[in-house]
Amino acid sequence: MSRRWKAIGAFAIAGVVAAIAVTAAAAHSSSKHSTTFSGTLNIMGFGTNGDDVAKNRFAIAQKAVAPAKVNAPNGGFNEQQFLTDIASKQVPDLVYWDRSYVGTYAAKGALMPLDSCIKSDKIDTSQYRQAALQSVTYNGHIYGIPEFFDVRTLIVDTHVADTSGVTGKMLNTANPTVLKQAALKMYQHSGSQVTRIGFDPKLPEFFPLWAKAFGANILSKDGLHPDLNSPQAIAALTYANSLIQAQGGYNAFLAFRNTWDFFGSDNQVAKNQVGAWPMEEWYYNVLASSSPNVNVTAIPFRSKTGDPINYSTGSAWSIPKGAKNAAAACQWMKTMTNASTWETVANIRKAAYAKAGQYWTGLFTANSKADAAINKPTSGEPKKWASIINTVEAAEKYSFALPASPASAQFNTAWTNAVNRVLQGQQSPTQALNQAQKEAVAAIKQATKK
């Protein structure tokens, strides 16, 4: 299961959730179907350990495919095992994985296109966010049903910003010059040691976000033509890297960042060790549970044109070619990702949070209908958390994703390694991205070789 829910912990609310959820599966009636399922549904990559959202959705989906049995060993997707399964023609019926895998395995012919599944089970694809669907669509066919939906906004420590004379208007990624000034106002050091990061651009992970903000599309819509060394992409990397170099340089910057108690009560916001940085939405849950009284807010990430943007990633369900129980797999995917299932488990969690005195900070999925219903501030919730939910929910509407590609892994490796070479001073942004472009072109050419 996604780290977002493991991160916020099963801690004190675990017992409450269990008590509330006892009748959840029995009460849920939205997944009625006419097909009678049988045999065993074998799933790879989905676990429920310590995760109430996963457990409750699992129970609902399990009921939907009954009397078929469900075999889902805890643990994430194992690519080496999956390759072995494909070679031996003993594939699981369903895989749960990062959406970046979908294009690669669809191109290999290892996945079933879901056209007939979507039609026979009447799966409403309009409920899923377009950015999520784009990342599971290859050569005109859908090969995955999207699940979670990462939303990246700027997390701002308002205490650090206020005491440094930095306003929200200055923390505007649409204005690189002013943003850098704000970063340096919040940055602190003692000699060569960094003691506070003013602004962390989150490299290499968020390079696609910076590239998009500067006007670059680093991969074509069909996933076949990389454009990693465009002037816009080079400018984006040059700027984002300059933020780190201006704050002590990469080694000192990274050394300090590695000291953060990221998931604990002494996290970098609670200890005022960072001014602002782009981050996925699940981290607000971490803050709300570990340090609910921190001074924090959310600001949209904006392109140089001033428009809000979000680089979305997330998980998906896919059916391998040769699956023996594809009918049950299709029903499982539909049930796990439909709006009524999300609403049921969200309400269970909300009730548990309320009983435990914890603040609700949202559950963000690839299902826009579900999110509209569940991501509303609860009564009595502090304004800062309510504001954060609203900001994240709004950001979902401005999302883009990297298209499905036959060489997604190699493409991601190419740009990640390029950014790392720049951070470590081994190459200039132009040199690094020129090399990455050659590597990506070669990888896609090899992957599409007949």
Outline where the language-model segments fall.
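C-terminal lobe and pocket-closing loops
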Residues: Y283-N293, G306-S312, S318-T413
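Short helix-initiation/N-cap motifs at beta->coil->alpha
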Residues: P73-F82, S100, A174-V178, L254-N267, ...
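Helix-loop-helix "hinge/cap" segment bordering the ligand-binding cleft or interdomain interface
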Residues: I118-K119, T137-F206, A216-L254, K321-A327, ...
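Conserved N-terminal structural module of periplasmic/extracytoplasmic solute-binding proteins
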Residues: S2-T104, K119-S126, T305, S340-T344, ...
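Extracytoplasmic/periplasmic substrate-binding proteins
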Residues: F206-L209, F214, L237-T335
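A local structural motif
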Residues: A64-N74, Q90-V91, G165-L171, K221-H225, ...
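Hinge/lid segment of periplasmic solute-binding proteins
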Residues: S100-R152, V178-A182, T297-I299, P382-K383
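Short helices/loops that flank or line small-molecule/ion binding pockets
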Residues: Q80-V91, K108, V160-A161, K180-H189, ...
